């Protein structure tokens, strides 16, 4: 039988471990634990640590404009959850209910543009994939969350025959054998390095790209000192570039220019994206890219020249298998990590695109037109189809044919013609402006007579007549032109 001292000690150990739980323990369900110790030995710092994820100091309020934007993002389904669940800190840390249908589409478009820019139109960059979680050794300072069966944990904690030392040993063994959730995409790419080196005939430089969800602890120092409040999620876009040491700094400069230019390309106010030099505790150089939100700058992407340390740490022993060709020389490459947060990037573009302008539909000067002027390549929906005056059945059939034609050509469409509730044109345009829909097409009885449709622009609010046969080519040319700017 354990003494009271041992019982109190065991409870203390359990409280320390359980402070890393991501939720309530239910029978048979995986729970999440995190180890938080002082770094020792050969532990390689994760990019979550290098970037300082999980901590967002309070900043001054962002004003009425931010509240209006948040309300639109909820009402138009860019974001899910209540106002209380969508605080600034929760959005920045990835601890919110998630994105709505339009938010998912916006992030998908942003990811597609990143992929096109970094992978599709670039030589020697290859896609890779890695597991979200896998077993791994329990290292000092390892802060990764681990998946643990609640039933296994409950059996250990309820065994009253265990001494304090046995209880601690059992819990540590559970952590060692459990799978840990990935905090970044870097190590998944490094695992592919040797195999992909053969793919390029050992010629440097080359890169490995991946987009995926990563997890990080979010700390609540107000309630529990060094305690974990919840698990943050973010969608990362990662390029790991393997380059000869002699050209590593030039490549870092190249990727910095490329990434900053890319972020600015889709912005209404490009100057809100900026960069700064940085250096980690080991003296490794890098750059950080920021977006200037109403409350201040927030990190959206990091670039690091990590040297050869990560590769040598992952592949100890035979260094020759790491050698790539730099001309006639065999060298261990430097690792450049280019790591962007697409969720924060999406939030940045929502703030960048939000505009309050005078409402041309009303004489009341205190009422403003609220519009999200997202870049044409990023806008979740390109065109809305609605019906005006005329025989409803015939007009809907025309809209359905147009809907299918546009979808077949990769143009996303909102089927407003299916709506049964009557709305004025003012209400329709306001709704579609808030959804960031580029164009509204109105099919009327005139369309049945001579093929002419009404086309209204989100950005200019101008309306024009166009023949229905020209709409597809017009939209394709418009989006293509915006992509090439």
UniProtKB/Swiss-Prot annotation:
Disorder: Progressive external ophthalmoplegia with mitochondrial DNA deletions, autosomal dominant, 4: A disorder characterized by progressive weakness of ocular muscles and levator muscle of the upper eyelid. In a minority of cases, it is associated with skeletal myopathy, which predominantly involves axial or proximal muscles and which causes abnormal fatigability and even permanent muscle weakness. Ragged-red fibers and atrophy are found on muscle biopsy. A large proportion of chronic ophthalmoplegias are associated with other symptoms, leading to a multisystemic pattern of this disease.
Function summary: Accessory subunit of DNA polymerase gamma solely responsible for replication of mitochondrial DNA (mtDNA). Acts as an allosteric regulator of the holoenzyme activities. Enhances the polymerase activity and the processivity of POLG by increasing its interactions with the DNA template. Suppresses POLG exonucleolytic proofreading especially toward homopolymeric templates bearing mismatched termini. Binds to single-stranded DNA.
Organism: Homo sapiens
Protein's gene: POLG2
Gene Ontology terms, MF aspect: DNA polymerase binding; DNA polymerase processivity factor activity; DNA-directed DNA polymerase activity; double-stranded DNA binding; identical protein binding
Modified residues (Phosphoserine): 38
Subunit and interaction comment: Heterotrimer composed of a catalytic subunit and a homodimer of accessory subunits (POLG:POLG2).
Comp. bias regions, Basic and acidic residues: 46-58
Record has Metal-binding as a keyword: no
Highest taxon above the source species: Eukaryota
Keywords: Disease variant, DNA replication, DNA-binding, Mitochondrion, Mitochondrion nucleoid, Phosphoprotein, Primary mitochondrial disease, Progressive external ophthalmoplegia, Transit peptide
Subcellular location: Mitochondrion; Mitochondrion matrix, Mitochondrion nucleoid
Name of this chain's protein: DNA polymerase subunit gamma-2
GO process terms (BP): DNA-templated DNA replication; in utero embryonic development; mitochondrial DNA replication; positive regulation of DNA-directed DNA polymerase activity
Pfam families assigned to the protein according to its UniProt record, in alphabetical order: HGTP_anticodon
Main location: mitochondrion
Database matches in InterPro entries: aa-tRNA-synth_II/BPL/LPL, Anticodon-bd, Anticodon-bd_dom_sf, Gly-tRNA_synthase/POLG2, POLG2_C
Region of interest called Disordered, as start-end residue ranges on this chain: 28-65
One Gene Ontology CC term in the entry: mitochondrial nucleoid
């Amino acid at each position: 039988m354990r003494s009271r001292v041992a019982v109190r000690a065991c409870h203390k150990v359990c409280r320390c471990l359980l402070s890393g739980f991501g939720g309530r323990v239910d029978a048979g369900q995986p729970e999440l634990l995190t180890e938080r110790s002082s770094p020792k030995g050969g532990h390689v710092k994760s990019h979550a640590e290098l970037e300082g994820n999980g901590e967002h100091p309070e900043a001054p309020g962002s004003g009425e404009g931010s509240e209006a934007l948040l309300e639109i993002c909820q009402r138009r389904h860019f974001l899910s959850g209540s106002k209380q669940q969508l605080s600034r800190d929760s959005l920045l840390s990835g601890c919110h209910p998630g994105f709505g249908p339009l938010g998912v589409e916006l992030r998908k478009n942003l990811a597609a543009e990143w992929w096109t820019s970094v992978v599709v139109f670039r030589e020697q960059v290859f896609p890779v994939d890695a597991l979200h979680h896998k077993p791994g050794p329990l290292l000092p300072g390892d802060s990764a969350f681990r998946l643990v069966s609640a039933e296994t944990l409950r059996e250990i904690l309820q065994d009253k025959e265990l001494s304090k030392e046995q209880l601690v040993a059992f819990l540590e063994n559970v952590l060692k054998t459990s799978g840990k959730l990935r905090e970044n995409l870097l190590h998944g790419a490094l695992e592919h390095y040797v195999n992909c080196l053969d793919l390029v005939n050992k010629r440097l430089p080359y890169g490995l790209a991946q987009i995926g969800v990563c997890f990080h602890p979010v700390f609540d120092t107000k309630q529990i000192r060094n305690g974990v409040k919840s698990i943050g999620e973010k969608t990362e876009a990662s390029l790991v570039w393997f380059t000869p040491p002699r050209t590593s700094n030039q490549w870092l400069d190249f990727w910095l220019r490329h990434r900053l230019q890319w972020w600015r390309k889709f912005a209404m106010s490009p100057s809100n994206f900026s960069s700064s030099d940085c250096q980690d505790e080991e003296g490794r150089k890098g750059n950080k890219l920021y977006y200037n939100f109403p409350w201040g700058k927030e990190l959206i992407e990091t670039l690091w020249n990590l040297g050869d340390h990560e590769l040598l740490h992952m592949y100890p022993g035979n260094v020759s298998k790491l050698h790539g060709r730099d001309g006639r020389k065999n060298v261990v490459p430097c690792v450049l990590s280019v790591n962007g947060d697409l969720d924060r990037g999406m939030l940045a573009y929502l703030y960048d695109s939000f505009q309050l302008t005078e409402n041309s539909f009303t004489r009341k000067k205190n009422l403003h037109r609220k519009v999200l002027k997202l870049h044409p390549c990023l806008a979740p929906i390109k065109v809305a189809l609605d019906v005006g005056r005329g025989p409803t059945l015939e007009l809907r059939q025309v809209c359905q044919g147009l809907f299918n034609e546009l979808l077949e050509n990769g143009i996303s469409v909102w089927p407003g013609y299916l709506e049964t509730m009557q709305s004025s044109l003012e209400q329709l345009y306001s709704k579609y402006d808030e959804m960031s829909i580029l164009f509204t097409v109105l099919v009327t009885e005139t369309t049945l007579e001579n093929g002419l449709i009404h086309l209204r622009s989100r950005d200019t609010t101008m309306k024009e007549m166009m023949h229905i046969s020209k709409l597809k080519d017009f939209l394709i040319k418009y989006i293509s032109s915006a992509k090439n700017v």
